[in-house]
Amino acid sequence: MRTEPDRKSSYGRSMTQTQQAQKILVTGATGTVGRQVVAELLARGHTVRALTRDPATADFPAGVEVVRGDLTDPDSLVPALVGVTGVHLITFGGAYFAPLETGPRILELARAAGVRRVTVLHGGEATPLEQAVRADGRVDWTVIMPVEFMGNALEWADGIVTAGEVREPFVSRLSAMVHEGDIGAVAAVALTEEGHGSQEYVITGPELLTVGDKVATIAAARGRDIALVELTEEEAVAQWRAAGHPEDVIGFLLEAYGNTPEVGRTVADTVEKVTGRPARTFGQWAAEHADTFRAG
C-alpha cells in the first residue's frame, strides 16, 4: 500500500539549512529520470557520482564525477560505491534493458560500503531488483513511481512542426502526467533527508489533462494553433507500426491509452508533501520546450 509523509517537516528547505553535503551515486544517470536526479542533487549542493556504461558519451555538467559500471555486473560498482551515502537505482540493465536479477548482490555491496539510503525507479511491474530492495531491512529504501512523463509529448514535435497537427487515438483519456524534474526532486529529497524509508511514492502532476488539453497548451506556448486529429484504434496501430514500434509496445500503448489505470488519472500531492513546493504544470513544461514545437 502506498504511504506518504503526514507532515511537511523540513522537506523542501535548502540543503544548507538542514544538513551537510552528501555524495550520491546515480545509476541510469544518462536516462530521462537519471539526468533529473543528477540535476536536482547538484542544485541542492550535493556531490554526484554518475554511473554509466559509456562515460565518454555521458555529457554531464561540470562537477559531476562520471564513473564506468554496469548493474548487470555488480562487482563493477565497487569503486563507485566508495564514500557514497545514497544510491539511486533502476530496475533494468544491459544492452537490451532486461529486468535486473542482481539486486541482492548490489544491496550487499551497498551495505558494505556504508550506503544508508536507496531509491528505486519503479519499472512498471514487480521486478526482481525492486523486490530485493523492498525485502531489505538494513537500508532506508524509497520506491519512486511516476505516472506518464510530460516529456512523452515530444513525440508530437515532428507532426506539429511539419504539418501543424497531432494524430492520436483516445483523445478524451485523462492523464495526471508529471514533469520529469519533479521526479528528480522527490528522489533527491528521499536520498538525502530522513523520513522516507519504506515509502512508496506515486508522483503525478497537479492536474488532469486530456489529449486536447495538452495540444491546446503546446499551441499556446508556441504561439500557433495545432490541429488535433483523432485516430481509430486501427489507424493508431498502423501509425505505430510504421514508426517501427514492436508488437509488444503497441499492445502496451493500446492498454495504457485505451484503458488508463486509475493511478495514472488520479492527482497525488506527493511532490508538494516531499519537496515543499507544488508540482509543475504542463503549461510550465510546454513553455520550457516551446522552441521544439516551432518550425525553424
What are these regions (language model features)?
Residues 69:
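Cofactor-binding loops of NAD(P)H-dependent oxidoreductases
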Residues 2, 10, 16-62, 72-84, ...:
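Oxidoreductase cofactor-interface core, primarily capturing Rossmann-like NAD(P)-dependent enzymes
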Residues 4-12, 233-296:
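A hydrophobic C-terminal alpha-helical subdomain
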